[in-house]
């Protein structure tokens, strides 16, 4: 019988503000400005900045920077709109850089 492993909660590395739940983790295969990044379907305790056009590895998007609501640290971005139908699944998702996170079980 497999052990029942609980999912982690992800926190801002700078101020310990809770940002995302393990059940909302979609992928660990993203790349941010500082290296590896995680995609989440939902994020909490964040401030979403203004929409901007940005060219990323997989194409052009409308994104918004995402900051911690407690300390103001820039964490990553939110996909607002894509122009490629194959990438449409990303719309509304949050990408947070691994170096900006800590996790606890």
Swiss-Prot record:
Which UniProt key words apply to this protein?
Metal-binding, Zinc
Ranges for domain Yippee:
8-105
Give the GO molecular function terms.
metal ion binding
Which Pfam families does the annotation name?
Yippee-Mis18 (PF03226)
Cellular component (GO) terms are: plasma membrane
Q: Where does Zn(2+) bind?
A: 12, 15, 68, 71
Q: Which domain of life is it from?
A: Eukaryota
Q: List the disulfide bonds.
A: none
State the similarity comment. Answer: Belongs to the yippee family.
Protein name per its UniProtKB record: Protein yippee-like At4g27740
